[in-house]
């Protein structure tokens, strides 16, 4: 396992609430939203605009627009001591000075991504079955995500392995940080915690909330109480 460089390693180890958000182009409130969610206790914030309402209305987020949105998130993350993550794009992560690059199963090979972003940023991996989990535990990624726990509109057509995979990963007792992901909200969180997860990734549980700060705070309180 790669030893993360300080101060990112300790920040990741202590993180429990990871938020993926789109650029909120149809609302125009990214700065206000990010500040509220981070004030509520979000530890990592990732920009992921694929399949968003903004993409459907305005088209795919171009690199210049993505970097502008990431600068907004970076400023908010710095104010709140949180980590900034970029999805898929190692070049964008490098240009944005992101703390974290998150890779899916079909993204750049890990060694290539590492050469692009350099030694300091953290790299995470998505996993959807036992074999992918085993690979993520063995390879030099800094954390991995497990799921989806439930089907989710942000990943249409993807079969959800459910909480069974979460239980399996929890039974491994790996020291590498991992997050349960997929359809998790405040109502479902107790089931996820009962399955053995202690870190989660959420989307709509905060992005669709009337009060993002309060929604994040309730999730964080439930996580730290275990």
Swiss-Prot record:
GO terms for cellular component: cytoplasm. Pathway: Cofactor biosynthesis; thiamine diphosphate biosynthesis; thiamine phosphate from 4-amino-2-methyl-5-diphosphomethylpyrimidine and 4-methyl-5-(2-phosphoethyl)-thiazole: step 1/1. 2-[(2R,5Z)-2-carboxy-4-methylthiazol-5(2H)-ylidene]ethyl phosphate binds at residues 152-154, 183. Keywords: Magnesium, Metal-binding, Thiamine biosynthesis, Transferase. Its cofactor is Mg(2+). Belongs to the thiamine-phosphate synthase family. This is Thiamine-phosphate synthase. It comes from Mycobacterium sp. (strain KMS).
